[in-house]
Amino acid sequence: MEHRAFKWPQPLAGNKPRIWYVGDYNPDQWPEEVWDEDVALMQQAGVNLVSVAIFSWAKLEPEEGVYDFDWLDRVIDKLGKAGIAVDLASGTASPPMWMTQAHPEILWVDYRGDVCQPGARQHWRATSPVFLDYALNLCRKMAEHYKDNPYVVSWHVSNEYGCHNRFDYSEDAERAFQKWCEKKYGTIDAVNDAWGTAFWAQRMNNFSEIIPPRFIGDGNFMNPGKLLDWKRFSSDALLDFYKAERDALLEIAPKPQTTNFMVSAGCTVLDYDKWGHDVDFVSNDHYFSPGEAHFDEMAYAACLTDGIARKNPWFLMEHSTSAVNWRPTNYRLEPGELVRDSLAHLAMGADAICYFQWRQSKAGAEKWHSAMVPHAGPDSQIFRDVCELGADLNKLADEGLLSTKLVKSKVAVVFDYESQWATEHTATPTQEVRHWTEPLDWFRALADNGLTADVVPVRGPWDEYEAVVLPSLAILSEQTTRRVREYVANGGKLFVTYYTGLVDDRDHVWLGGYPGSIRDVVGVRVEEFAPMGTDAPGTMDHLDLDNGTVAHDFADVITSVADTAHVVASFKADKWTGFDGAPAITVNDFGDGKAAYVGARLGREGLAKSLPALLEELGIETSAEDDRGEVVRVERADETGENHFVFLFNRTHDVAVVDVEGEPLVASLAQVNESEHTAAIQPNGVLVVKL
């Protein structure tokens, strides 16, 4: 799959390259007399780019065929003359009320047949030819009007596709799904084979009999092959819509373009890796997860975004200065986290740090969502932090950070959107296992052992790493299977977990015992699964291992171990369970490489405790013992080595003391002792040095 050529928004004429800094700006929500104050405050904060007109369709086209760009012209002119570039939105994120009144057929339909009414956002369906015509018309009008504007440096196409309209079960979608299946499979017999329709008398005679996976009754089970393809189709339908908008803009005004993804550990709405091939530069919206996993999940998501971008620079298009508005409890950021979180994304490869939004709304559904200028105004800690961050970003740019990229790790944790979709089905061995949790646990456990891993999509170049983790990768296609086998045979070091290689890319089980097509690579054969839980008293709710760890939720029944393999850890259990002394963790020699197999869900803590022995078995070196796990070290460097930056993040609630090598550039909640070449990094603190 080919990537579009990478294109990055360039600075305004006469300006030098900077780390792009600010985010969504919604001047149409405020009286015009506020605009001049906004621009002055932006200059004070070091802002150099804003995204404008994302949800402005009703103001850009107040009546059908009547366009008003005058207000937007004035905004862009004020910004540009102040040295602030514009990432201009297509304006098509949500249709105006006049359109939905005239054309209710553009509204998406849920699986029970209920129509999504206007009143919020993103109530349009991706397969509506009517809505597509309106959207493309606005794109062309925007492109024509702003094609020669010197202050517009990039296109922001729509917004967070699929956030609310991921699935549409309308008649438009039904016809599009039929065409998608015909293109993918060619014949209806091939569809029947792929979906296993011989089961439950679901065989179809022609493509017109294909329908979306609508409501089938409470407690029933949808055909899993069909459901997996439906998720693929839904992602592709939105992708096709985006590409149509993109092409309409670029045909007239060929500026760098993007659309904002929603990459996080648990957000798998679309196949963002596939989408990443069709943008000029990757951009992402990330909102922190409150609690003890806050930093680790954020770092993981940033690493995955970097993997989707194939280590090209990427935009952090949205994150928050503090609380969001859409959780049951909207926790604020702790002191220091505004700066630390932004620098974490920067460390992981982002060359743009942007927020939702510039000025906190005084009305509307997101009025309680934090912003760079909060309700309290510029005399606030949030705005002071915003200004501090702006100065830090300018300093790092002056020191040459923009010439660097995230330094490649020795370990790649593989992530697969389709494996997550497959594990979401309601008829699986257990509902407690989902693909997305295991990569995050491995990322955290590796960090506990001094290794900051890269997170690489399954289509990505993971086989170029010294070591690779396949964490509950339920789907192993024939192509991926070949890559795995070649990787280990040629000397690769592989970690494989339970729930990996169960099915192929049609969701058909690999027969002969698990893990399917790579049993000989890992050197074990699993005959059966042993899910665990607390809902049936008298059954197993956990399993102890003889290395001091505990398995929960899931374990493999490993019935044979190859002569080329040896057991690293075994289960300790009552005789009645059949698990006492059974293999739990093994290492196998395969070709010139080694493959470790972890046959149970150990969680972050169990993995962290098991990894030292496994890392030693596979010959993978880790960091010094004295700071293991307390501090995350991330490096950015250029190809020449002239510019090399080290970011040190305290991921604990205690002060972390580290040795300092190089020149300290940014110290947020960190005190540097220059005479002793050490630094004390406070909780939520970060230190950036240049080697």
UniProtKB/Swiss-Prot annotation:
Keyword annotations of the record: Glycosidase, Hydrolase
GO biological process, one term: galactose metabolic process
Pfam families the UniProt entry points to: Glyco_hydro_42 (PF02449), Glyco_hydro_42C (PF08533), Glyco_hydro_42M (PF08532)
Annotated residues for binding of substrate: 121, 159, 326, 366-369
Amino-acid biosynthesis recorded as keyword: no
Superkingdom as given in the UniProt entry: Bacteria
Cross-referenced InterPro entries: Beta_galactosidase_C, Beta_galactosidase_Trimer, Class_I_gatase-like, Glyco_hydro_42, Glyco_hydro_42_N, Glyco_hydro_b, Glycoside_hydrolase_SF
MF annotations from Gene Ontology: beta-galactosidase activity
Listed EC numbers: 3.2.1.23
Active site: 160 (proton donor), 318 (nucleophile)
GO (cellular component) term, any one: beta-galactosidase complex
CDD domains with a match to the protein in the record: A4_beta-galactosidase_middle_domain
Reactions catalysed: Hydrolysis of terminal non-reducing beta-D-galactose residues in beta-D-galactosides
Function of the molecule: Specific for beta-D-anomer-linked galactoside substrates. Hydrolyzes o-nitrophenyl-beta-D-galactopyranoside (ONPG), chromogen 5-bromo-4-chloro-3-indolyl-beta-D-galactopyranoside (X-gal) and to a lesser extent lactose. Hydrolyzes p-nitrophenyl-beta-D-galacturonide very slightly. Does not hydrolyze maltose, sucrose, raffinose or melibiose. Has some transgalactosylation activity yielding galacto-oligosaccharides (GaOS), including O-beta-D-galactopyranosyl-(1,3)-O-beta-D-galactopyranosyl-(1-4)-D-glucopyranose.
Family, per entry: Belongs to the glycosyl hydrolase 42 family.
Protein name: Beta-galactosidase III
Species of provenance: Bifidobacterium longum subsp. infantis
Gene that produces this protein: beta-galIII
